[in-house]
A protein has these predicted regions:
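Conserved, structured core segments of small domains
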Residues: 1-133
Length: 133
């Protein structure tokens, strides 16, 4: 695990149905905690960008660019939103992710370092540099 990323860390929120079994008061309480969490990160200068995602979407795949419906909101793997954080280490990003108010209700948070360059582009650049040497 690479401990630092100068490009930040992405928190991907998965499990878009975490609130379905809760009362409206419980959802209101958790969202109040979520908004306080977000404000604290913003005020501390750690939040670069954030957004929820709509449930509907499409997937484009294959050589022909086939389009299909999905991902499906019912899926535990569906991404419901993201935070882009400006923090120096994976450890700090993980600590922030652990503070997510909806974790106890089944939401999961994937933490990924943002790469400085697409791995395929890096490989192509290195191959080009090697061939010129």
């Amino acid at each position: 695990m690479k401990p630092t990323s100068s490009n930040g860390y992405l928190l991907l929120f998965r499990g878009t149905n975490w609130h379905r079994e809760l009362t409206s008061n419980e959802v209101t309480q958790i969202m109040s905690e979520w908004n306080q969490w977000f404000e604290r990160l913003s005020n501390d200068g750690k939040m670069v960008a954030a957004s929820p995602l709509e449930n509907e979407g499409h997937i484009v795949s294959g050589k022909a660019g086939a389009v299909s419906d999905g991902p499906f909101a019912e899926s535990k793997e569906a991404i419901g939103g993201f935070f882009l954080l400006n923090v120096p280490t994976m450890e700090e990003a993980l600590e922030i992710a652990k503070q997510c108010p909806a974790l106890p209700q089944g939401l999961t948070v994937e933490v990924r370092p943002v790469a400085p360059m697409c791995p395929a582009n890096r490989m192509a650049s290195e191959a080009k540099a090697t061939s010129l040497a």
